[in-house]
Design a protein with these regions (language model features):
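Short, charged beta->alpha transition segments
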Residues: 50-59, 84-87
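Short, glycine/charge-rich beta-strand/loop segments that flank catalytic centers
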Residues: 71
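Single conserved hydrophobic/aromatic residue that forms the stacking wall/gate
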Residues: 1-7
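Short, conserved catalytic or adaptor-binding loops enriched in Gly and charged residues
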Residues: 36, 90-94
């Protein structure tokens, strides 16, 4: 189908480190953020976009609008976006604009992969309903995995007891984490030392992906490009993917992954 144009319009979340507010947009300074997090006692917090911010983004010439949010189990972004769609439709009953909100049930690079699929389907000439249907099927087939260098952020966010975090840190135990079908976080396993944990994660990724040669795999790293390249090399030894891409984490992803964290979505 010719003449179809698509564009991505990021809607920023806001991060807060001990009262210092940071927008998760192109101005995000990862190194400064990680320094502030390391020095913080309480740890970072985040706030999702308001319905009004989403509604402002809906304005424009596009007849088809697709929103991809953080997992509804991890953030209020999905509920805020759904509310925004309902409010917008009430105020613009006859505008002819079709809007759909995808709950990524993932985070970080997982959202990016979903956005890429939406663009692929839309530019292929599929109808709005068919784009939604096929993208939802893609989301259901996706998996997200991650390994953290430190448990500090999870501890400060109340996800771990101080004792569990202390024991894991003392024994150099690194958990291998992943997403559930609903988009929550679960522990898949653990290993002593970061390299063993990364190797375990790679094995889990390959075991969970039945059609590797047809899928794009994405690696997102927080300030550790060499580690990301190591993971890529390990994956290529075990399976052949359609493509493997590596990107650095942005704001909210840097908050959850913390310095040295690795996230995989496929």
């Amino acid at each position: 189908m010719t003449g179809v144009q698509t564009c991505a319009l990021p809607i920023s979340l806001e991060l807060d480190v001990d009262g210092y507010r940071i927008r998760d947009d192109e101005s995000f300074d990862q190194h400064d953020f990680l320094r502030r997090v390391k020095e913080s006692v309480k740890g970072p917090k985040s706030s999702c976009p308001s319905p009004e911010e989403y509604m402002q983004a809906f304005e424009g010439e596009a007849d088809h609008v697709y929103v991809v949010t953080l997992s509804g189990k991890l953030s209020g972004s999905y509920n805020s976006a759904v509310l925004a769609v309902n409010l917008y439709n009430e105020e613009h009953e006859d505008c002819g604009k079709q809007i759909y909100v995808f709950n990524s049930r993932s985070a970080s690079i997982g959202e990016t992969l979903i956005g890429m699929k939406v663009q692929e389907f839309e530019e292929s000439g599929l109808s709005f309903d068919e784009v939604v249907k096929q993208t939802e099927e893609y989301i259901s087939s996706m998996n997200t995995f991650f390994v953290l260098e430190t448990l500090d952020t999870l501890r400060k966010a109340g996800r771990l007891s101080n004792l569990k975090a202390f024991v894991a840190s003392t024994l150099n135990i690194k958990p291998v984490m992943g997403s559930t079908d609903e988009g929550s976080i679960q522990q898949l396993g653990q290993a002593r030392g970061i390299k063993r944990a990364l190797a375990k994660m790679v094995e889990d990724v390959v075991a969970a992906t039945k059609d590797c040669e047809h899928r794009i795999l994405a690696i997102s790293h927080c300030n550790c490009p060499e580690r990301a390249q190591y993971v890529k090399a390990c994956l290529e030894k075990l399976a052949r993917f359609k493509k493997i891409v590596i990107v650095d984490t942005a704001g909210i992803s840097s908050m959850y992954a913390n310095d040295g964290g690795i996230i995989i979505a496929v």
